[in-house]
Amino acid sequence: MGRLRPEEISSILKGAITDYESRVRTEEVGQVLEVGDGIARVHGLSNVMYQEMVEFEDARGEKVIGLALNLEEDNVGVIIAGDDRYILEGSTVRRTGRLASVPVGQGVLGRVINALGQPIDGRGEIQAEETRPVEIIAPGIIRRKDVDTPLQTGIKAIDSMIPIGRGQRELIIGDRKTGKTALAVDTIINQHDQNVKCIYVAVGQKDSAVAGVVAQLEEYGAMEYTTVINASASQPAPLQYLAPYAGCAIGEYFMHRGEDALVIYDDLSKHAVAYRQMMLLLRRPPGREAYPGDIFYLHSRLLERAARMSEEYGGGSLTALPIIETKAGDISAYIPTNVISITDGQIFLDLDLFNANQRPAIDVGLSVSRVGSSAQIKAMKKVAGTLKLDLSQYRELASFAQFGSDLDKATQETLARGERLTALLKQRERDPMPVEEQVAVIFGGTQGLLREVEPDDVPDWEAQLREYLRSSHEDLLKDIREKKELTDETAERLREAIERFNEGFEPARSEVKVETRPQEEEGEEG
């Protein structure tokens, strides 16, 4: 190898200096001033963003995620989304530059994850297409369209009288142990042929209750299109706070792809309690019932993200079914009234009805769907149009009838009809019904074709009628299913079919009557 001349060395050095790029990696690092109860006060992160994820290095050398929520002049209040036992005064905290986000896509379906999107089902890492921020601004008015497509729950009482549309927010509210979680799980099971992706968010529930819900979803094949997010009572309040937003972000991914998604928040009462705990520890001023001043905004910004997108923006939808637990049936308390005012209607479950074996225990008088009727199929609207009024009249007359026995014939007929309609709306748990069968069954009830059937025999009548129509009149059911209408000709054919069935109907009196919805319920403690 020849020697380099001095001028060559000089030119090589000049070239190296010219091509040199300085790469300086800067990190903003802070120190923990105090820590306790899942909250840390941190000094030194002067440029941290609101809701930015930060990384603690604990005494074991492990990394723990936190979320910056209080941005004060000389320190930052951080909620710790993990084990804070080994985070000590003086521990190092680093900015990540990322807002809280979760993995989304087909890879999360069939999985059980925590509020940070980490798998907790022991089935390995999640193969996600991308991540989405858990907090995002809801779509504006221009990007939305009217709710015009039904979300079939498979529950007769809901699909007929309190219909839910895709993109709607319908509150399920009631005392503990009244069947709230059962309604939600049945709705998920009914989506098996509806092409709706489901997200079930459990906040503050027992792990055993959530495991029970997952087992039921697996048994009915519903986990294939469902993601379960578990932020149980044993997990830190920050994870319970984040869980609904994480579930919403996963649902939004499908909505923005033009698909339909359903997200269930079980329940937002415990979500509000977790938020109150965090805010009190961060020393934010308490208001009514010690909740912070922005408790309404906590839920409104979550539920406003449910939408039916216009065709120009993909035409997808995100339907929200939040659950609220009341105390002694008091729906006028702070959190229940907040969420009632945010949502597009509510399904109120009554403990007295539940104990009287009317299950699902829906109080028709207090339940309403403000936008769902425009999404209801025409066939259901036609057969169930007077159902709510008939039941209201029956309940009113029944309360007066107990005081006297001298009732005129018209009153007796109204009571008898109401008794049969009430029995007709009972439904077993985990037995969602296709909408065409619902139309046929309710048609029989509202058209007086149950007159000769004893109220106790109505469940047998319904089960046998469904079997009879499936075996002998499949064309009739197919006609209702595909056209979604009940023309005069179809109605006449249906009437004739039910009348023929009634002639040979024999109640199976030896069988045990409908033990409807015996509820091990609620992923909540009830």
From Swiss-Prot:
A Pfam short name: ATP-synt_ab_C
Positions bearing the site annotation: Required for activity: 367
Enzyme class: translocase
Matches recorded under PROSITE patterns: ATPASE_ALPHA_BETA
Cellular location(s): Cell membrane
Highest rank taxon of the organism: Bacteria
Keywords noted in UniProt: ATP synthesis, ATP-binding, Cell membrane, CF(1), Hydrogen ion transport, Ion transport, Membrane, Nucleotide-binding, Translocase, Transport
Membrane topology, as annotated: Peripheral membrane protein
Chief site of localization: membrane
Catalysed transformations (reactions): ATP + H2O + 4 H(+)(in) = ADP + phosphate + 5 H(+)(out)
Gene Ontology MF terms in the entry: ADP binding; ATP binding; proton-transporting ATP synthase activity, rotational mechanism
Cellular component GO terms held in the UniProt record: plasma membrane; proton-transporting ATP synthase complex
Region (Disordered): 505-526
Binding site for ATP: 174-181
Signal peptide: none
EC number(s) from the headed UniProt entry: 7.1.2.2
Function: Produces ATP from ADP in the presence of a proton gradient across the membrane. The alpha chain is a regulatory subunit.
Assembly with partners or alone: F-type ATPases have 2 components, CF(1) - the catalytic core - and CF(0) - the membrane proton channel. CF(1) has five subunits: alpha(3), beta(3), gamma(1), delta(1), epsilon(1). CF(0) has three main subunits: a(1), b(2) and c(9-12). The alpha and beta chains form an alternating ring which encloses part of the gamma chain. CF(1) is attached to CF(0) by a central stalk formed by the gamma and epsilon chains, while a peripheral stalk is formed by the delta and b chains.
Protein's name in the database: ATP synthase subunit alpha
Gene name per UniProt: atpA
